[in-house]
Amino acid sequence: MALRTAASEQLIRQQREQRTLVAGLRKKERALKQELKKQQQQADALGRRIQQVIEEEARKAAAAAAAKKKNATQKSTAPSGYLMSKDEEQLSRNFAQNRGKLPTPLSGRYRIIAHFGTQQHPDLKYVKINNQGIDLQTQPGTRARSVFDGVVTSIFVMPGYNTSVIVRHGNYLTIYSNLSTIYVKTGDKVKTGQELGVIYSDPEEDNRTVLHFQIRKETTKLDPELWLKK
């Protein structure tokens, strides 16, 4: 009888511990889902900001062309409406010819922790993530660098992504997000491999250092892994 009672009490304790464990896991899952939702909202906000920058650049280019009608025949129009000079046309062609040959957008070692497009979350079965670029994890102090010759057209700050730098290569654009210290300013011409700034290290996550990188042909999002050299 005593043995049966002890076994029953042990079973009750195990069941209680199991319920506590399950409750804890569910709580962590809810917290993770909330954090992922916040991150996705921040990513969407970044995407909208980039879209606004591209559209504003197109408007400015069109206005400049209208103000100089005598040179209008020397301009060509990209699919989105961005008016390119002859030099920009050539830069676009050069960029396109380097598909699969571009250097990595950072110095030093790295690993890709999030790929382009919609994908299944590794830990949450029914959660999908939509990434407009790729995320590269590296070491603290690593610099982001331009993958091709171009012009810095915009620098801005967004929640969750710190400072972003956009470099235009004709009608192609590369975006470098989650930077802290910035080495360039709007209007600067940059060369392939030129350092743009230091990638932010998060002190609340053991100095986790991640660069978010995008490539676009005007408003069309492209998979950076198809453009970078393997």
Predicted segments, located by residue:
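Alpha-helical oligomerization segments with coiled-coil/rod-like character
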Residues: 1-84, 88-91
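Conserved, short, structured surface segments that act as functional micro-motifs
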Residues: 165-168, 186-230
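Generic structural motif
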Residues: 104-114, 142-152, 193
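Zn2+-dependent peptidoglycan hydrolase active-site motif and core
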Residues: 129, 146-181
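Short glycine/threonine/proline-enriched tight-turn/helix- or strand-capping micro-motif at secondary-structure
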Residues: 81-99, 113-146, 169-170, 210, ...
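Solvent-exposed coil/turn segments that connect beta secondary-structure elements
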Residues: 28, 51, 117-118, 141, ...
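Residue "hotspots" at secondary-structure boundaries inside conserved domains
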Residues: 142-145, 182, 188
